[in-house]
Regions:
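Bacterial N-terminal signal peptides
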Residues: 7-18
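Soluble periplasmic/extracytoplasmic beta-strand elements of cell-envelope proteins
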Residues: 38, 58, 71, 109-113, ...
Length: 252
């Protein structure tokens, strides 16, 4: 049972969002950033996501909890925002919001059918298989804060190269800045980066292997710039493909 969905949504957005790249990550309007989108909620929350089709977005389920209205934010060339309606929100049936709060494994994935197409370039999903080892490199792109606690630094898509640490597997992957190794503040997800795509280079092309679910500060403290927690998509690929078909969206 979801306790206080609106309050919980705010708590998740501000305490769990992976930092859309704190630590000096550079803007990334091309490459990985072309597929990243920004989402906002009526309770003051904001997250990232990734376009899988012109009319379909993948994000974290905890970004679109019941009890609020959500919009996709599209920026024009002058960085003026336009709010785009969502037609349908489909959360994975096995998602457990309390698990996200504890940084535990859960099906933290949701699909958003858009009322109208977006300009973003759809990103391909990584095929199943391909084990993840410590030190493997990934690219994360999101709209989160560049400086923790400074809301003015959010809203620009930034990308950061992070590496796997700990014991990566099919249930959860933890990423860190290879320069700081989580021991001091470095690159990583922050507020507004939840739902951001995590890319892996597969045969010279970037493909989405997971999405951001949470972040920590250095030394596993609260905050950003330490660990970036990723929900791998391999075990949910069948569900994503099935739901995309039901929603009438064609995946690349």
């Amino acid at each position: 049972m979801i306790r206080g969905a609106a309050t919980l949504a705010c708590a998740l957005a501000w305490s769990l969002s992976a930092a859309a790249m704190v630590g000096g990550a550079q803007p990334a309007d091309d490459g990985a950033g072309r597929s990243a989108v920004m989402l906002t909620g009526s309770r003051g929350t904001f997250c990232s996501g990734v376009a899988l089709a012109r009319d379909l977005v993948l994000t974290a389920a905890h970004c679109v909890l019941p009890g609020a209205d959500y919009k996709l934010v599209e920026l024009d060339a002058a960085r003026q925002p336009a709010l785009k309606d969502l037609a349908t929100i489909v959360r994975h049936p096995e998602f457990d919001v309390t698990a996200v709060l504890r940084h535990r494994v859960t099906a933290d994935v949701a699909l958003l059918k858009l009322a109208a197409p977006v300009k973003n370039v759809p990103a391909p999903l990584a095929p199943p298989g391909g084990a993840v080892a410590v030190g493997d490199s990934f690219m994360v792109a999101g709209y989160g804060l560049a400086v923790r606690g400074d809301g003015k630094t959010g809203g620009t898509v930034r990308a950061a190269a992070l590496v796997a640490t700990g014991q990566p597997g099919s249930l959860q992957i933890r990423l860190t800045d290879p320069a700081s190794k989580g021991e001091r503040a470095g690159l990583g997800a922050c507020t507004g980066d939840s739902g951001a795509p995590v890319f892996r280079d597969i045969n010279g092309a970037l493909a989405v292997i997971g999405i951001v679910s949470w972040s920590t500060g250095p030394g596993n403290s609260e905050g950003c710039g330490g660990l970036t927690g990723v929900t791998p998509l391999a075990r949910y690929l069948g569900w994503i493909i099935e739901q995309a078909g039901k929603l009438g969206s064609r995946l690349p």
